[in-house]
């Protein structure tokens, strides 16, 4: 009999483990979550936070979301190929990154979503129009906010989270119209009262003075610069806390939000900021306005189109003057940001860079002397020089860019000469002698050459 070789195949199940997201969260260990996170994200570190949840009702899906410990260096690159949310339908893998499951501002969150309701043959084009996907997306955002709340319970953990993903929270306030109030609770800022720690808006409101109606803030490059800004002088004198907003994205955030817990935001670098005053203070300010009317008019005539108007300030304490922008125009910091844009719209910039208002401190010695000089002689040349010098220094202290650096340097040099009691005519004569001396040597040299 002929022997027949019989081949049998035995199949071994490779994925013996039940998918992690289908298990009860109580039965999953921290180590299992960490291993799963590293497998789907290619990260070498454990996640900072984990959210394992399921949604049941009109639709059903399970999900695990992770927050990494560090933000990727190219997180805000527009053309970056992302690998964030993996989509499964009834445990069948559909795609590596489903962009429609998460808004852009949550681009740092990693995880998986397994839906029971989406069709297995769904295409990328159909996903964008799918109503089920929109409901899943809404639930994911909600659960992510809950996860951030859990992180915020530990002060040190949230400090690390905010250092890495604070910009994303602010981007969410700008883009997410459904959750701005909730996202504002996650914001942290330095302030005049917070010291080395950052403060929440909620804590700021609890520390507000009796009768204080606004949340005062100022935008700029750094905390160090803002601490010495002339804009916060009067607020500090009155014991009012001021928030320091030092990131460019803060400017865009404040365009979106107007209040927090019924307290309106007030930018100290713009017009329309008023502090609570007693009747005595109001009367004194009115008297100062009347006394400075002629001086303000003269300064406006000297400066011309450089400023819209010159007024008496109620926000200065020790500085002679500052420049403020209109309530709805760009601040000095925003103007600087837009100047640095490589492809900015020049026509839009010209429209938004509204004319500045110069505010004077009537109690400052320089302004008092200027007032006396104006009253003595409106055509005094020194007055004109002093006005331009005050305007240029106000540009610098208020965060603007100097319009004429050369002219500013010349005026400073003239003031230095006055301080050193140098005579400009004598100096000019000396310069002429120095210039003519080499000319004689040149003539002599050429004559010798002719003799040779």
Curated annotation (Swiss-Prot):
<protein>
    <recommendedName>
        <fullName>Heat shock protein 83</fullName>
    </recommendedName>
</protein>
<dbReference type="GO" id="GO:0051082">
    <property type="term" value="F:unfolded protein binding"/>
</dbReference>
<dbReference type="GO" id="GO:0005737">
    <property type="term" value="C:cytoplasm"/>
</dbReference>
<keyword id="KW-0143">Chaperone</keyword>
<dbReference type="GO" id="GO:0005524">
    <property type="term" value="F:ATP binding"/>
</dbReference>
<dbReference type="InterPro" id="IPR001404">
    <property type="entry name" value="Hsp90_fam"/>
</dbReference>
<dbReference type="GO" id="GO:0016887">
    <property type="term" value="F:ATP hydrolysis activity"/>
</dbReference>
<feature type="short sequence motif" description="TPR repeat-binding">
    <location>
        <begin position="448"/>
        <end position="452"/>
    </location>
</feature>
<comment type="subunit">
    <text>Homodimer.</text>
</comment>
<keyword id="KW-0547">Nucleotide-binding</keyword>
<keyword id="KW-0346">Stress response</keyword>
<comment type="function">
    <text>Molecular chaperone that promotes the maturation, structural maintenance and proper regulation of specific target proteins involved for instance in cell cycle control and signal transduction. Undergoes a functional cycle that is linked to its ATPase activity. This cycle probably induces conformational changes in the client proteins, thereby causing their activation. Interacts dynamically with various co-chaperones that modulate its substrate recognition, ATPase cycle and chaperone function.</text>
</comment>
<dbReference type="GO" id="GO:0140662">
    <property type="term" value="F:ATP-dependent protein folding chaperone"/>
</dbReference>
<comment type="similarity">
    <text>Belongs to the heat shock protein 90 family.</text>
</comment>
<keyword id="KW-0067">ATP-binding</keyword>
<keyword id="KW-0963">Cytoplasm</keyword>
<dbReference type="InterPro" id="IPR020568">
    <property type="entry name" value="Ribosomal_Su5_D2-typ_SF"/>
</dbReference>
<feature type="binding site">
    <location>
        <position position="124"/>
    </location>
    <ligand>
        <name>ATP</name>
    </ligand>
</feature>
<dbReference type="Pfam" id="PF00183">
    <property type="entry name" value="HSP90"/>
</dbReference>
<dbReference type="InterPro" id="IPR037196">
    <property type="entry name" value="HSP90_C"/>
</dbReference>
């Amino acid at each position: 009999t002929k022997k027949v070789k019989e081949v049998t195949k035995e199949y071994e199940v490779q994925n013996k483990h039940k998918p992690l997201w289908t298990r009860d969260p109580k039965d999953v260990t921290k180590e299992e979550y960490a291993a799963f996170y590293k497998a789907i994200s290619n990260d070498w570190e454990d996640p900072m936070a984990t959210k394992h949840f399921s949604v049941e009702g009109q639709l059903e899906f399970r999900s695990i979301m992770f927050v990494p410990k560090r933000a990727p260096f190219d997180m805000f690159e527009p053309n970056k190929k992302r690998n964030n949310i993996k989509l499964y339908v009834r445990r069948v893998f559909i795609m590596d990154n489903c962009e429609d499951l998460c808004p852009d501002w949550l681009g740092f969150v990693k995880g998986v979503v397994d839906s029971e309701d989406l069709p297995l043959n769904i295409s990328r084009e159909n996903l964008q129009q799918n109503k089920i996907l929109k409901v899943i997306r809404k639930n994911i955002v909600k659960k992510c906010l809950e996860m951030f709340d859990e992180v915020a319970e530990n002060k040190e953990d949230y400090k690390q989270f905010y250092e890495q993903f604070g910009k994303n929270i602010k981007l969410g306030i700008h883009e997410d119209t459904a959750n701005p109030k909730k996202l504002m609770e996650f914001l942290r800022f330095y302030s005049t009262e917070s010291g080395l720690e950052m403060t929440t808006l909620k804590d700021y409101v609890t520390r507000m003075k009796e009768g204080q109606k606004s949340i005062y803030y100022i935008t700029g490059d750094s905390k160090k610069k803002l601490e010495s800004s002339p804009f916060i002088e009067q607020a500090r004198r009155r014991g009012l806390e001021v928030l320091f907003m030092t990131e460019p994205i803060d400017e865009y955030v404040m365009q979106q939000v107007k209040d927090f817990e019924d307290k309106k935001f007030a930018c100290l670098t713009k017009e329309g900021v008023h502090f609570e005053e007693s009747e005595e203070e109001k009367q004194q300010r009115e008297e100062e306005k009347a006394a400075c009317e002629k001086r303000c008019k003269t300064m406006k005539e000297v400066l011309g189109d450089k400023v819209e108007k010159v007024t008496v300030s109620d926000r200065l304490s020790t500085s002679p003057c500052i420049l403020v922008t209109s309530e709805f125009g760009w601040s000095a910091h925003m103007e600087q940001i837009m100047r640095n844009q490589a492809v900015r719209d020049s026509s839009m910039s010209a429209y938004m860079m509204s004319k500045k208002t110069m505010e004077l401190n009537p109690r400052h010695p320089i302004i008092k002397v200027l007032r006396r000089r104006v009253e003595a002689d409106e055509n005094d040349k020194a007055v004109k020089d002093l006005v331009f010098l005050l305007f240029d220094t106000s540009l610098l202290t208020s965060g603007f860019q100097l319009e004429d650096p050369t002219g500013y340097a010349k005026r400073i040099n003239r003031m230095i000469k006055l301080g050193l009691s140098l005579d400009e005519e004598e100096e000019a004569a000396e310069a002429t002698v120095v210039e003519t001396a080499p000319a004689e040597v040149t003539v002599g040299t050429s004559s010798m050459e002719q003799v040779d």
